[in-house]
From Swiss-Prot:
Gene symbol of the encoding locus: N
An annotated GO cellular component: virion component
Source domain of life: Viruses
Chain's role: Structural protein that is not essential for the viral replication either in tissue culture or in its natural host.
Organism: Murine coronavirus (strain 3)
Name recorded for this polypeptide: Protein I
Length: 207
């Protein structure tokens, strides 16, 4: 009758059992069973079948709270010795953790690629919100690209280079004359940009 009335659940161990557990210590397998989530702290009270507990028993002086941090186990350790290619898994693991170190001892260099920003448009973030501002391309960049194109034409021959340079200059003069007409039509008197001094095709040397 007394055995049938035993309370269900955990029973309080004796002093001898507590001393035995203190002497043996908590093994790694017990910690793995106790804490399935790695990297989480648990206060462990020995003597209660290695179950997590934050209570302290004042009746036993040998019983103390212990805190153990379980090491992070890499998901590649189980696949490392069975001949499975773990390159894709490693990349997913690195991208998920945003780290350049894997616990297996593999170091990788994560180099950031060049940012592809449009030259004509940049985004400016302010405290009031998102504001976009357009800027004109840098003249030096355009001139460098034009110079490289002309140098390639010179490698092909002098005649194609002279023809392209003359076409470029005629198009540029046409654009300047059109710009002067637009400025006269839209700007008020006194703010007209002095574009009358633009050299004409007659004053330019023939190539």
């Amino acid at each position: 009758m007394e055995s049938s009335r035993r309370p269900l659940g955990l029973t309080k161990p004796s002093v001898d059992q507590i001393i035995k557990i203190e002497a043996e210590g908590i093994s790694q397998s017990r910690l793995q069973l106790l804490n399935p989530t790695p990297g989480v702290w648990f206060p462990i009270t020995p003597g209660f079948l290695a179950l997590p507990s934050s209570k302290r028993e004042r009746s036993f002086s040998l019983q103390k709270d212990k805190e153990c941090l379980l090491p992070m186990e890499s998901p590649l350790q189980s696949k490392r010795d069975i001949g499975i290619d773990t390159t894709a898994v490693l990349l997913k693991h690195l991208m998920g953790s945003r780290s350049n170190y894997c616990p297996d001892g593999i170091f990788t260099i994560l180099a950031q690629g060049p940012m592809l920003e449009p030259v004509m448009e940049t985004a400016l973030k302010e405290s009031s919100g998102l504001q976009t501002a357009k800027r004109t391309p840098i003249p030096a960049l355009i001139l460098s690209k034009g110079t490289q194109a002309v140098m390639r034409l010179f490698l092909l021959g002098l005649r194609p280079a002279r023809y392209c340079l003359r076409a470029f200059m005629l198009k540029a003069l046409e654009g300047l004359h059109l710009l002067a007409d637009l400025v006269r039509g839209h700007n008020p008197v006194g703010q007209i940009i002095a574009l009358e001094a633009v050299p004409t095709s007659a004053s330019l040397p023939l190539l």
